[in-house]
């Protein structure tokens, strides 16, 4: 729990920092400090190993630029030396004018692009320090210095918590269809595609590198000997990310997971003309959740044989072209791809050049706040599609912030996918039965529909009973002191409670996970009740208005 408490404490400090205002800022600024502490621990670990073998070791960061020198000088008792440790304006000035320029130079001085040193230069070339207060910066440094990355347990806990911060960032960044891909879904996709040592794994829209990190976790269990490990480290994972912050996070995320020098580059995948892709460029495995609904310049659209304005459809063409013959892919995409008329040519291309063997239909709520339904396409290149196995995921509950998708939800899919078994949730479609537009819509022929034997009159009575019960329950829950004029005006806006009310004076991020879930559940219940209240207020108000109008007519009649 040390990492969770530290991350929460750092977020609280950053909330008071003028240069940071969003979850994206919190993650970015925490990341570069965490990264430098990680490098210091890595240097110490390598120094010990070198000393035990009698070898010389040159640390990655040298002299005063080491974390242990500028950030956390220690007393003889092992505590931070408050006398010699910089703080305030001196610390902020050192970071901006000396540390960052020093780190950016690594891109020029590294022996090759395939080194950790080069990646350090790349990362800090994209970064700037947004923590303008040197006092806030000192507080954060002291918190991070308490963390350690020596043991496997330490590293695992850190990556788990780092992923949770990435999740917050992903759900805060909603431009151009960018959403955080739930890790249980990624792990399931990786298991189905089953990448092997010696195969290349590619994500051309890698975001925070979730697919690449999970593929690494999966494949490292297959490592036998130093040659396999070298292959996994240097010649396996490839990613491209267009935007600077996700690129930085992706690179750090892979390093934290254990890939020393990730092959992730910053660039626009869609700027690559399909006609320029050579056999040597192609990859054996593609795992991706491409952005949807974004926009590209006209010259970028010209790189694709099938004309489209939808970025996800451009990426689909790229995937098909980039796969080696015999290569495998697992792709998350909006379910409208299956049926939209403007995607029919692309569906036909996919079915002709690849074996689209599996479509996993995901329920709403998998991507929090996205408001779209998605599917996962599993296909192999080199053989045309003859049959498609569908699986309609039904977790038996509404997915959301407090009811996220889990690996248990996907267990039945994984089990049945091995044999393409038919069930209430799965079925097979023969491609020869498809129409000219190759409509791949999810139409479950095996779903058991409960037949309602009630008469129309009985159904109407049930609806009336439900409306009356709901209205009574809501009125019981309402307290009229939430409205002005002692509850006389039911249709006025609620009066906000004072900010200093005791039960509102708390820090959400400081709560335990259990309490957070309780708060989230209460928020959802309140939101649902407010929605119901709005639904019943309108007809009630209309009835009252009608009665008041009749009342006014009677008064006017008597005045005459």
Task: Write out the residue ranges for each language-model feature.
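A generic structural signal for well-ordered coil/turn residues at beta-strand boundaries
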Residues: 23, 282, 286, 372-373, ...
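Conserved S-adenosyl-L-methionine
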Residues: 176-288, 293-295, 300, 307-309, ...
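Hydrophobic alpha-helix feature that most strongly marks membrane-spanning transmembrane helices
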Residues: 220, 255, 291, 321-324, ...
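Conserved nucleotide-binding/hydrolysis micro-motifs of P-loop NTPases
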Residues: 41, 244-245, 270-271, 291-294, ...
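Conserved P-loop NTPase
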Residues: 376, 380-412
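Non-catalytic, mostly N-terminal accessory regions of nucleic-acid modification and defense proteins
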Residues: 1-197, 265-272, 277, 361-364, ...
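Conserved, well-folded catalytic cores of nucleic-acid-processing
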Residues: 13, 147, 164, 168, ...
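Conserved Class I SAM-dependent methyltransferase catalytic core
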Residues: 22, 244-247, 308-379
């Amino acid at each position: 729990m040390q990492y969770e408490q530290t991350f929460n404490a750092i977020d609280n400090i950053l909330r008071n920092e003028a240069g940071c205002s969003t979850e994206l800022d919190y993650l970015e600024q925490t990341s570069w400090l965490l990264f430098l502490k990680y490098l210091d621990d890595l240097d110490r670990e390598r120094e010990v190993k070198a000393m035990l073998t009698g070898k010389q070791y040159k640390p990655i960061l040298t002299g005063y630029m080491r974390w242990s020198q500028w950030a956390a000088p220690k007393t003889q008792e092992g505590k931070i030396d408050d006398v010699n440790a910089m703080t305030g304006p001196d610390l902020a000035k050192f970071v901006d004018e000396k540390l960052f320029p020093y780190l950016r130079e690594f891109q020029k001085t590294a022996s090759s692009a395939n080194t950790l040193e080069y990646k350090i230069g790349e990362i800090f070339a994209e970064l700037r320090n947004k923590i303008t207060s040197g006092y806030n910066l000192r507080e954060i440094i002291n918190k991070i210095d308490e963390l350690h990355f020596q043991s496997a347990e330490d590293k695992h806990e850190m990556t788990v918590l780092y992923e949770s911060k990435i999740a917050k960032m992903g759900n805060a960044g909603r431009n151009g269809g960018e959403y955080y891909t739930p890790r249980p879904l990624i792990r399931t996709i990786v298991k189905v595609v089953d990448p092997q040592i010696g195969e290349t794994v590619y994500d051309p829209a890698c975001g925070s590198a979730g697919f690449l990190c999970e593929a690494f976790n999966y494949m490292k269990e297959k490592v036998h000997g130093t040659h396999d490990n070298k292959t996994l480290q240097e010649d396996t994972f490839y990613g491209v990310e267009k935007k600077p912050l996700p690129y930085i996070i992706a690179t750090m995320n892979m390093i934290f997971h254990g890939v020393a020098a990730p092959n992730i580059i910053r660039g626009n995948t869609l700027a690559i003309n399909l006609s320029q892709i050579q056999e040597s460029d192609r990859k054996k495995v593609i795992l991706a959740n491409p952005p949807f609904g974004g926009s590209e310049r006209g010259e970028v659209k010209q790189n694709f044989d099938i004309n489209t304005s939808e970025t996800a459809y451009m990426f689909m063409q790229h995937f098909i072209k980039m796969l080696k013959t015999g290569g495998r892919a697992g792709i998350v995409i909006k379910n409208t791809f299956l049926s939209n008329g403007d995607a029919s040519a692309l569906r036909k291309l996919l079915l002709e050049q690849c074996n689209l063997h599996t479509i996993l239909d995901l329920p709403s709520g998998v991507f929090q706040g996205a408001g779209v339904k998605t599917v996962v396409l599993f296909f192999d290149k080199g053989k045309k599609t003859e049959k498609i196995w569908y699986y309609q995921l039904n977790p038996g509950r509404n997915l959301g912030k407090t009811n996220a998708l889990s690996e248990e939800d996907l267990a039945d899919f994984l089990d049945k996918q091995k044999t393409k078994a038919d069930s209430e949730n799965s079925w097979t479609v023969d491609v020869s039965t498809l129409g000219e537009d190759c409509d791949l819509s999810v139409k479950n022929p095996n779903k058991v529909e409960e037949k309602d034997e009630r008469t129309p009159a009985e159904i109407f009575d049930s609806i009336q009973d439900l409306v009356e019960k709901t209205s009574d329950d809501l009125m019981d829950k309402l307290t009229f002191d939430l409205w002005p004029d002692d509850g006389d005006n039911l249709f006025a806006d609620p009066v906000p409670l004072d900010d200093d009310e005791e039960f509102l004076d708390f820090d959400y991020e400081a709560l335990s996970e259990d309490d957070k879930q309780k708060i989230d559940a209460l928020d959802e219940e309140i939101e649902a009740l407010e929605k119901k209240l709005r639904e019943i207020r309108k007809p009630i108000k209309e009835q009252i208005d009608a009665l008041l109008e009749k009342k006014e007519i009677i008064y006017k009649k008597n005045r005459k």
